[in-house]
Amino acid sequence: MPSYELALVLRQLPRPELISVIRRTAESILDKGGIIRKLENLGSRALPHKVSEHGVVHREGTHFTIAFDTAPTKIADLKEEFGRDIDIIRRYIFKVEEPEQKPCTLHEEMLPPAYRKDVQEIIAAAQKKQKKKFNYNSGLDYYPFQK
């Protein structure tokens, strides 16, 4: 199952109601067969601009991120369900890309440039690429336009 991150902006709520909204959100992820990896509260902040959602204008919100794994077919259902929730102002689901694993090449990079494999490849490519000389192909063994 791929990893996803849900960024939520909730309306200003008292703590008990805030907990019930987060619980409701987490249960909907679990009901769809997801696995919650991390829940992070980013705190209450003023929104960058006023946001109108479900007929109410919001200027402040509580921000949360939830890292979870679920099947890609369930993402549309989650977006639709979160869109109907009146306590959620904004919701964004991002697919988390796994970081590319690069092998350690420190022992090769510590070699002098003449011994490095990538430098040798560059030198070999430069030697292969030589400027082509124009061939006249006139059939004559002399150049007739010479003075």
From Swiss-Prot:
Pfam families, per the entry: Ribosomal_S6
Record has DNA repair as a keyword: no
Source organism, top-level taxon: Eukaryota
GO biological process, one term: mitochondrial translation
Coiled-coil region: none
Record flagged with keyword Iron: no
Localization of this protein: Mitochondrion
Cited InterPro entries: Ribosomal_bS6, Ribosomal_bS6_sf, Transl_elong_EF1B/ribsomal_bS6
Major subcellular location class: mitochondrion
GO molecular function, one term: structural constituent of ribosome
Quaternary structure note: Component of the mitochondrial ribosome small subunit (28S) which comprises a 12S rRNA and about 30 distinct proteins.
Name of the featured protein: Small ribosomal subunit protein bS6m
